[in-house]
Amino acid sequence: MSKIYDWFEERLEIQAIADDISSKYVPPHVNIFYCLGGIVFVSFLIQVATGFAMTFYYRPTVAEAFTSVEYIMTDVNFGWLIRSIHRWSVSMMVLMMILHVFRVYLTGGFKKPRELTWVTGVILGVLTVSFGVTGYSLPWDQIGYWAVKIVTGVPDAVPVVGASIVELLRGGVSVGQGTLTRFYSLHTFVLPLLTAVFMLMHFLMIRKQGISGPL
């Protein structure tokens, strides 16, 4: 094993990377409330893992969506547990995100030179809410259908471009298969990709600038 490690160490300098990560200075004022952002990240990873598992059985069609969710809950081994963890972890993600925002605001973590870190955090908050909106529709039950109808109908009040925005969101004039397809694509591909990108940016800026000082 040592020879294999030495081979990689010679080419990638693994030890130098490990030393840099482990030797990062942590200010003495840091407490458990500074871990809230990390809990959000862990919740996101759980979302990705459980969501990916459900894509093997979920069918994004108006005729089969609800039936496929029922199948996951009743017939797939541990399917009920996977879907329940998916739902619980999103609740945890939203709660921890709200608490994280309060902690950052109260400790002044948004001030110079960390303005961009705050901006990426706000974008991540919007993406998190978007996950909830798009995911709510996927079972395509009565609650999901009417929730989507109301949410996608909100832009209709915007002058001139409102109707076009509604049609873009719904994939047509009315809520239907086009809407479900769009929301499924957003929920399983577009939003996770954007979230991963902005999380990486968020972490790199924190890594570069360090943790903000106490009040």
From Swiss-Prot:
Binding-site residues, heme b 2: 86, 187
Q: Its Gene Ontology biological processes?
A: photosynthesis; respiratory electron transport chain
State the needed cofactors, names only: heme b; heme c
Query: Which positions in this protein are listed as binding heme c?
Result: 35
PROSITE patterns, A to Z: CYTB_NTER
The primary site where this protein sits is plastid
The membrane-topology field of this record reads: Multi-pass membrane protein
Q: Where does heme b 1 bind?
A: 100, 202
State its location(s).
Plastid, Chloroplast thylakoid membrane
The Gene Ontology CC terms held by the record are: chloroplast thylakoid membrane
Mind telling me which residue stretches traverse the membrane in this protein? 32-52, 90-110, 116-136, 186-206
Q: From the Swiss-Prot or TrEMBL record, what is one GO molecular function term?
A: metal ion binding
Keywords on record: Chloroplast, Electron transport, Heme, Iron, Membrane, Metal-binding, Photosynthesis, Plastid, Thylakoid, Transmembrane, Transmembrane helix, Transport
Q: What does this protein's record comment on cofactor binding? A: Binds 2 heme b groups non-covalently with two histidine residues as axial ligands.
- Asked if the record carries the keyword Transmembrane helix, the reply is yes
Something else the entry says is: Heme 1 (or BH or b566) is high-potential and absorbs at about 566 nm, and heme 2 (or BL or b562) is low-potential and absorbs at about 562 nm.
Q: How does it assemble?
A: The 4 large subunits of the cytochrome b6-f complex are cytochrome b6, subunit IV (17 kDa polypeptide, PetD), cytochrome f and the Rieske protein, while the 4 small subunits are PetG, PetL, PetM and PetN. The complex functions as a dimer.
Protein family per UniProt: Belongs to the cytochrome b family. PetB subfamily.
Its biological function?
Component of the cytochrome b6-f complex, which mediates electron transfer between photosystem II (PSII) and photosystem I (PSI), cyclic electron flow around PSI, and state transitions.
Q: Which NCBIfam families match?
A: PRK03735.1
The protein's name is: Cytochrome b6
